[in-house]
């Protein structure tokens, strides 16, 4: 099992916030290798940066299984994927999280990532576009942050 950080645009987060019955039940992407780049049990932490530059951690998802297309995934979840432009989906293990809002910039600057490449001091959403594998120390720090904010 591996752990990763993934970035969503603030528009994607707002779409989730405004979707009736939304929970982080699945994760979609247009990446060609999306079905094979992860495996059952992988843990994904999601963050976003808003227009004012505030970086927030907003969800985490433990991957359960690759479900395929939007048409194959939508019957399995309690909300519509009609406005979501992705071609492939992973389902998350239950219970599914709702959104949380945890300040993340200070901690993000300390993350080593498996690559050993830290974020630059003045990072923005462009620096977070690539899905990054986390170290076990990174995961521990993120979990401690989540615990401090939401228990």
Annotate each language-model stretch with its function.
Residues 1-40:
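Short N-terminal edge-element motif at the start of the domain
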Residues 56-67:
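Short beta-strand-centered aromatic/proline hotspots
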Residues 27, 32-33, 70-151:
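Contiguous surface segments at macromolecular interaction interfaces
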């Amino acid at each position: 099992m591996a752990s990763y950080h993934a970035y969503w645009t603030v528009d994607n987060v707002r779409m989730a916030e405004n979707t009736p019955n939304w929970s982080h039940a699945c994760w979609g992407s247009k990446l060609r290798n999306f079905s094979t780049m992860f495996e059952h049990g992988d843990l994904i932490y999601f963050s976003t940066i808003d227009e004012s530059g505030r970086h927030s951690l907003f969800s985490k998802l433990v991957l359960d299984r690759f479900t395929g297309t939007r048409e194959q995934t939508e019957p399995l979840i309690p909300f519509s994927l009609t406005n979501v432009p992705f071609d492939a989906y992973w389902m998350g293990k239950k219970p599914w999280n709702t959104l949380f809002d945890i300040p993340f910039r200070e901690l993000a600057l300390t993350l080593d990532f498996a690559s050993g490449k830290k974020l630059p001091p003045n990072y923005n959403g462009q620096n977070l576009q690539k899905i990054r594998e986390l170290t076990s120390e990174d995961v521990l720090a993120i979990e401690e942050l989540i615990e401090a904010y939401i228990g």
